[in-house]
């Protein structure tokens, strides 16, 4: 059957399922641990589905990202506006017409788009959705630490073949909400009392990374930062105020968030949400802070997609965004990963600095055809984000040199090839490291991460008005590094320079200047006889455990202030 035949009678094709294809044949549909099915959804129940429409000029977008992010380029710092990006990538008129005609034929009338017109979110009944997407069968599920309810399909969906050039994927069918990987570790044993700290607080962060009481935002510049939250949990203003009363006495700070984008619920505060806000606002002290709250409260929504669509619908955004979200690369479809990567590319073109946590499972581990391999995570493995690993103090109660935090995520992507900006650093690591795992465990030619690191072990957090000690994870290191970059943006903006934007090309060109090199320790991996739980190990220069290292603020400011 030819394309013209497929285009004729779309509604009949929806009903018959003929002349169809699967956009996400490789999407994992196994039920994540901790989730249970509650049975079929009511046919008249409504859900929302997000249609990712095919974009134009993605290769040109990639070239522009390189041009505006490379300090040696005459285009460096000349970022695109949202309108520029929209003009470049907006779906073709044929794509817009074809998809809209198909949706209208199926009775989908409650739809809204974004400025770039490349996402379309529609509300449909379950009955309509199952007719629209042959093969889909929607069930209720409950799971996660907060007993979250979602509607998902355990079966693959199909689209009419006529839509193959026009739709990348449909969101809201398979992917389950992320879960927090934060750990609360046992308190280490104290062996002395001189010069001790009793856990990581803002004063410990500021001392270790050489931030003085004067290293805060001016409160007068057009500078802002943001964190994004997807775990159906919230921060509380009262917790932030108490945290600053307890730990913010030695530096100027803001005790409230400037703006919440999305839904801010009234339930109990979440530790991860509290951690993100409290340490972004204490490292990037006295800088206007936004919180993107995309909890995915409606059962059909994918909260990470919601956040990406918010970025595509706001012309004026904070310069630095920190995100503590990730999934195993192998759990996601190729169509989804490639499209999300393009969204991250769009943000880089606009001069946004996106920082993602590297994860808290070391190198990870899974079995492929009976053999163990390391397990990279995404979006940490995207070549268009700066990924943050984790460290611990060499002496747990002393502000000393840092070593690897054994949970710090890192490794090599199985999806994205190594970007040119890190070719020299990664090649040097692979040729000089004395402790490389067997080559069968990782893809040595893939995008390597993390890029940088910060302390990730033993934080104090205030949640539901209770100070909680020994919270650990790269969800802690990421907002700390983000706040420090916001302070550098403050100096750049006040001196008439553009914000840092996508950092990696510059970071790798400067070979770790302005960072403390972390050279001791290894992270965890597969518990088998061959690697015995050990992944990669840190060493001089860049490594796939702590990247280039942790921030030394005065030196990093000097390195990144010009041009």
Curated annotation (Swiss-Prot):
Result after altering residue 286 to S: In CLN2; enzymatically inactive; lacks one oligosaccharide chain resulting in enzymatic inactivation and possibly prelysosomal protein degradation; altered intracellular trafficking
Gene3D superfamilies tied to this protein: Peptidase S8/S53 domain
A Gene Ontology biological process term: central nervous system development
Top-level EC class as recorded in UniProt: hydrolase
Cofactor(s) named in the record: Ca(2+)
Main subcellular location of this protein, as a coarse class: other
Reaction equation(s) it catalyzes: Release of an N-terminal tripeptide from a polypeptide, but also has endopeptidase activity
Impact noted for substituting residue 277 to M: In CLN2; displays no residual enzyme activity; altered intracellular trafficking; demonstrates enhanced processing in response to folding improvement treatment
All residue ranges annotated as the Peptidase S53 domain in the record: 199-563
UniProt-annotated binding residues for Ca(2+): 517-518, 539, 541, 543
A single cellular component GO annotation: recycling endosome
EC number: 3.4.14.9
Propeptide residue interval(s): 20-195
Recorded consequence of changing residue 77 to R: In CLN2; displays very low residual enzyme activity; altered intracellular trafficking
Subunit structure, interactors included: Monomer. Interacts with CLN5. Interacts with CLN3.
Illness the protein is tied to: Ceroid lipofuscinosis, neuronal, 2: A form of neuronal ceroid lipofuscinosis. Neuronal ceroid lipofuscinoses are progressive neurodegenerative, lysosomal storage diseases characterized by intracellular accumulation of autofluorescent liposomal material, and clinically by seizures, dementia, visual loss, and/or cerebral atrophy. The lipopigment pattern seen most often in CLN2 consists of curvilinear profiles.
Protein name per the record: Tripeptidyl-peptidase 1
Organism of origin: Homo sapiens
Gene name per UniProt: TPP1
């Amino acid at each position: 059957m030819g394309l013209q035949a497929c285009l004729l009678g779309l509604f009949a094709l929806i009903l018959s399922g003929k002349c169809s294809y699967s956009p996400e044949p490789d999407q994992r549909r196994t039920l994540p641990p901790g989730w249970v099915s509650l049975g079929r959804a009511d046919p008249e129940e409504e859900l929302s589905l997000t249609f990712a429409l095919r974009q134009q000029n993605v290769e040109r977008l990639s070239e522009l990202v390189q041009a505006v992010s490379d300090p040696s380029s005459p285009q460096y710092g000349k970022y695109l506006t949202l309108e520029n990006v929209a003009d470049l990538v907006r779906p073709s008129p044929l794509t817009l017409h074809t998809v809209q005609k198909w949706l209208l034929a199926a009775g989908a009338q409650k739809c809204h788009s974004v400025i770039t017109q490349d996402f379309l979110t529609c509300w449909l009944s379950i009955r309509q959705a199952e007719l629209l997407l042959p093969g889909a069968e929607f069930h209720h599920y409950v799971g996660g630490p907060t007993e979250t309810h979602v509607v998902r399909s355990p079966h693959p969906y199909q689209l009419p073949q006529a839509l193959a050039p026009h739709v990348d994927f449909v969101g809201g069918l398979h992917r389950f909400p992320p879960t927090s990987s934060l750990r609360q570790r046992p308190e280490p044993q104290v062996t002395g009392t001189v010069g001790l700290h009793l856990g990581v607080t803002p004063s410990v962060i500021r001392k270790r990374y050489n931030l003085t009481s004067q290293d805060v935002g001016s409160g007068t510049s057009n500078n802002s930062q943001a964190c994004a939250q997807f775990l159906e949990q919230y921060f509380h203003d009262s917790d932030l105020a108490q945290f600053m009363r307890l730990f913010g006495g030695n530096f100027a700070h803001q005790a409230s968030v400037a703006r919440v984008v999305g839904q801010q619920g009234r339930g109990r505060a979440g530790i991860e949400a509290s951690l993100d806000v409290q340490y972004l606002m204490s490292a990037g002290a006295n800088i206007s802070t936004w919180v993107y709250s995309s909890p995915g409260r409606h059962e059909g929504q994918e909260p990470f997609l919601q956040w990406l669509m918010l970025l595509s619908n706001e012309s004026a955004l904070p310069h630095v965004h920190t995100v503590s979200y990730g999934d195993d690369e192998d759990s996601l479809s190729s169509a989804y990963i490639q499209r999300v990567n393009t969204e991250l590319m769009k943000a880089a073109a606009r001069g946004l600095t996106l920082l993602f946590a590297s994860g808290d499972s070391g190198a990870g581990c899974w079995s492929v055809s009976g053999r163990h391999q390391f397990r990279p995570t995404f979006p940490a493995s995207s070549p268009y984000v700066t990924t943050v690993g984790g460290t611990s103090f060499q002496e747990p109660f002393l502000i000393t040199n840092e070593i690897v935090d054994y949970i710090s995520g890192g490794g090599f992507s199985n999806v994205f090839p190594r970007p040119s900006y890190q070719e020299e650093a990664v090649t040097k690591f692979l040729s000089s490291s004395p402790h490389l795992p067997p080559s069968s465990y990782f893809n040595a030619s893939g995008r390597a991460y993390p890029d940088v690191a910060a302390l990730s072990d033993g934080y104090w957090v205030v949640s539901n008005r209770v100070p909680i000690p020994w919270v650990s994870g790269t969800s802690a290191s990421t907002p700390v590094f983000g706040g420090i970059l916001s302070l550098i943006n403050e100096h750049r903006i006040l001196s008439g320079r553009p914000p840092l934007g996508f950092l990696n090309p510059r970071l790798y060109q400067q070979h770790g200047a302005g960072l403390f090199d972390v050279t001791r320790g290894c992270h965890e991996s597969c518990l088998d006889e061959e690697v015995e739980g050990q992944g990669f190990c840190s060493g001089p220069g860049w490594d796939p455990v702590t990247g280039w290292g942790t921030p030394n603020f005065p030196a990093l400011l000097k390195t990144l202030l010009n041009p």
